[in-house]
Amino acid sequence: MPKPVIAIVGRPNVGKSTIFNRIVGERVSIVEDIPGVTRDRIYSAGEWLNHEFNIIDTGGIDIGDEPFLTQIRQQAEVAIDEADVIIFMTNGRDGVTAADEEVAKILYRSNKPVVLAVNKVDNPEMRSDIYDFYALGFGEPFPISGTHGLGLGDLLDEAAQHFPKIEEDGYDEDTIRFSLIGRPNVGKSSLVNALLGQERVIVSNVAGTTRDAVDTPYSKDGKDYVIIDTAGMRKKGKVYESTEKYSVLRALRAIERSDVVLVVLDGEEGIIEQDKKIAGYAHDSGRAVVIVVNKWDAVKKDEKTMKAFEENIRAHFQFLEYAPIVFLSAKTRKRTQTLIPVIDEVNESHSIRIQTNVLNDVIMDAVAMNPTPTHNGSRLKIFYATQVAVKPPTFVVFVNDPELLHFSYERFLKNRLRESFGFVGTPIHIIARARD
């Protein structure tokens, strides 16, 4: 099920990006003491006391020629639309400002849970200054310091109290859930309609007609599926409507609910940098992946065109070397019937479980074929391996020193596992662990 979403909202230069980086544990956002320095939305996963969530740094959205308060209003409205909980960030050094009050008015009308944070309270003497923030109407203000990491535990405790209860989606466990992700107008909704044989999803030539994820139950040859069609992911800076600002987040939430992710490309336009970024989301999710090249009917081709396009995909998406590629046309429905069997295959691979004795035979054969690497005179020793998870298949390899497992040798082991067991369309995770 989708993780809860926290949005950090506030006027520029209250420290949203610093707090975001503290929560996710790494420096993802650019942080400078200049209002509006965070130029785009930053998304990341966080965890607090066994609560997993997604978090958005909304700092400095579309900083440009628009009036200052309009920027704030757009930022808050977008966060309201997507978030389950909003952290309203203010600056204790500045006190309550007119801009804070503008944000508060919008959030107060939202009926979304709001946790009020007063940042830059860097020492105990400043705590008495936070009481003015009660006037914003959101109850107790939580004093925090992004610079020193103070008060974040209490803040996240309060935010977690407002996370929605996890509910099952009502579909059978055997139902295969697959999502379609890609740039606007690559034909995702047309592909859904081609599979269903009806105009289930509104389709037009306007990029981004599908505004949100739409679930569609679907049955074929006695098997049940749920198709999750997502709003297109736009290249940053091109679109300013608030309904588009979190299309990436919507797609990420759809991916979380999926067993299989279809990365849809436009065969007519070819591959652009945004496609690579979108494909990266699919790979990072650990879901099974199929690359779909749509609009193949519109491509001028000969007997070498498909092979050349496939080689281009492999060059751009080296991290998805395991993903099968399907060429089709949603418009003419040519080859669309080949897609479902591929989805079945990668979903099955995603769930493969290997017996420990069989797994170790393959690992030891691999070591005999290609001896383990050495570093500073020490050789990697692999004692045994075991599979600890599926979706994706995850293996723990017990070794003398995890630092000796070089990524190139890890890749070699993954390739041997693929050759032995298939694993079509699914990533493989290998975790090196020292033997006690």
Curated annotation (Swiss-Prot):
Keyword annotations of the record: GTP-binding, Nucleotide-binding, Repeat, Ribosome biogenesis
The keyword Repeat belongs to this UniProt entry's keyword annotation: yes
One of the record's GO molecular function terms: GTP binding
Domain of life: Bacteria
NCBIfam families in alphabetical order: GTPase_EngA, small_GTP
PANTHER family attached to this UniProt entry: GTPASE DER
Name of the protein this chain belongs to: GTPase Der
Organism taxonomic ancestry: Bacteria, Bacillati, Bacillota, Bacilli, Bacillales
Gene name linked to the record: der
